[in-house]
Amino acid sequence: MKKIFVLLLCCVLVVACSDDKRYAPKEGRVSVFEAKVPILAKGSVQVATSEKVSSWSQPFYNIQNKQPNQSVSQNEKIWRERIGKPIDFNRLLATPIVIKEAIYTLDGTHKLTKTNMLTGERIWEKEIAQNKNGLSLSYTNDKLFTLSTDGLLTAFDEEGNQLWQKDFAVATRAPIIADRNILYLITTHNQFIVLNTKNGNELWRYQTTLPQTLLTNMAPAAKSKGVVVVPFSTGEVIGFDADSGLLLWIQMMVGNRPQDLTEVPQIAAAPVIEGDVVYLTGHANFSGAYSLKTGETKWTVNFGSRLTPILSGNTLFMLTTQNELVALDKKTGKAFWLKVYKTEDHPWQSISLVNSEIVLSDGEHLLYINPVDGSKIRVENKELSTLPIAIDGHLITVDESAKLTVY
């Protein structure tokens, strides 16, 4: 009887401890990364002060894809509403756009909805087209743009009136980016198309080599200081003069290691621009920092990621394809620290910075991590399928069942 009691007690202890260890850093092994990039002997992580932002106009916040250190002031749910059809293999949910306390959402069946951020009141909704799957939303100069996975591009005003529509009849997997009077579109056939926001007329385009096999979604372009940086599924990243379309530089985001299924040349992480530097992350175990104007290499590291990294203060935070969460000195590419965070049933889907804490999402939970040393802080049960967005202190999430929640 005593043996049975001890056995039952051990089982209880194991169950009680399992949740704490679910996202614990893996210990007892040396990362390939650690052997290739020396950990800094001196120096520490510094992140920018968290800020309340009042709008979110692009899939990754702005046209530089540089997400802020978001400020959230409360954690209690205010309201929750379903905005359309749930996600499945063929349906995607676009990252919401938030403008003037209104949330714009695009569901997997290409239905566009405008909702009051504070009350959850449905302002209007539009069925854009039948038999279309929504991909992305973007906003500029009082105009909203929706893109389907088969190249249907539609422009609306803030009242939901359709301004124009163009059907490119080509597969698209990269979110569209809108900047003032210009739209940037990337197709799966590796065409980069530049359009006027007024009427959708084409300004110029570029065609690179034949497409590679797509294992994930493609990354959007980024623009700053007259240069637009475009990632292609071939592993090429090209810098163009934004006005003329003149090719300025080319970088291949492919490392030195032999390719396997985890090292395809496709680029899923968006370019991130800060100042005169663009940070590029490939899927094929290769990332680096480059001159925005010339493409000159500043530093490279032999690991990759499928998630857009976070740049804040003196640090670039990245989750590698091997689940290595790493904090890099943005000037040298050397590491302040590295931790390996495992997941159970779902891969990590996003990385963000909220209230000066790194936040990883696997679709069902949010894992909060200390940016100074990479240690786990806590886990919250929050389901989401897009980036968490914080506007005026409110956290906004969309889950796989197409439920929009504001905290």
Briefly describe each language-model feature range.
Residues 18-21:
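Bacterial signal peptide processing site
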